[in-house]
Design a protein with these regions (language model features):
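Acidic anion/phosphate-binding donor-loop and adjacent secondary structure
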Residues: 1-12, 54-55, 179
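Conserved donor-binding/catalytic core segment of Leloir-type glycosyltransferases
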Residues: 8-26, 35, 43-46
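Nucleotide-activated donor-binding/catalytic signature segment of Leloir-type glycosyltransferases, i.e.
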Residues: 13, 47, 52-77
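Short hydrophobic "strand-cap" motifs at the C-terminus of beta-strands
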Residues: 16-20, 46-47, 65, 92, ...
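Acidic, amphipathic alpha-helical patches
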Residues: 31, 70-73, 101, 136, ...
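Nucleotide-sugar-dependent
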Residues: 71, 75-76, 83-106, 113-123
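A charged, aromatic-enriched C-terminal amphipathic alpha-helix characteristic of glycosyltransferases
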Residues: 148-176
């Protein structure tokens, strides 16, 4: 049983959360615009700061909680209402394949992402894709209002097909078919 950590427990929901490296790949302008447009939402980032002293967003509803132990992330994920993948679209991000996508989905949480090619190719059936701050807000509102129908069922099904056990089983089948 996971318990919500103290440093996130008192943050006002809904909580839009991200965990991972906090670096130049994060679209801080997008996050600032989301925080400004929706002061009733809380945006939470977890992870090590990479090549920066502090996060550039200074809003009362923006919370940087620092680096956390990997084993504690499920406890934080439990507090998230929507998971974020707010990456800048640039040469740095065109070829990334964020491992957090299946991690978020394994937690059964809705995800909103900027248009990362690998996320679109592999997860657009369960991840909301948004190119602008307005779209990001709209997709997040849809996730929060549960206007997405059977999304939770589809998230679980997708997470199962992206687990290491499932992938290993599929690879074993392919190898067996070669013989």
């Amino acid at each position: 049983e996971t318990s919500i950590p103290d440093d996130i427990k008192n943050i006002k929901p809904p909580i839009l959360g991200y965990f991972g490296a906090v670096d130049e790949r994060i679209d801080f302008k997008l996050l600032d615009e989301v925080c400004a447009a929706r002061p009733d939402w809380s945006v939470v980032l977890l992870g090590p700061l990479v090549q920066m002293e502090k996060t550039p967003v200074e809003r009362p509803n923006f919370h940087y909680l620092g680096k956390k132990n990997y084993g504690d992330l499920p406890n934080y994920l439990k507090a998230f209402d929507v998971c974020l993948m707010p990456f800048v679209i640039s040469d740095l991000t065109l070829h990334i394949s964020p491992t957090k996508t299946p991690e978020y989905l394994a937690g059964g949480k809705p995800v909103v992402s900027t248009p990362i090619p690998d996320v679109i190719a592999d997860y657009s059936d369960v991840v909301a894709i948004a190119s602008t701050s307005e779209e990001f807000i709209q997709k997040t509102e849809e996730c929060l209002s549960d206007k997405i129908g059977d999304l939770h069922i589809r998230i679980r099904q997708k997470a199962e097909t992206k687990s290491w056990d499932y992938i290993a089983g599929e690879m074993k089948k392919m190898i067996m078919n070669l013989e």
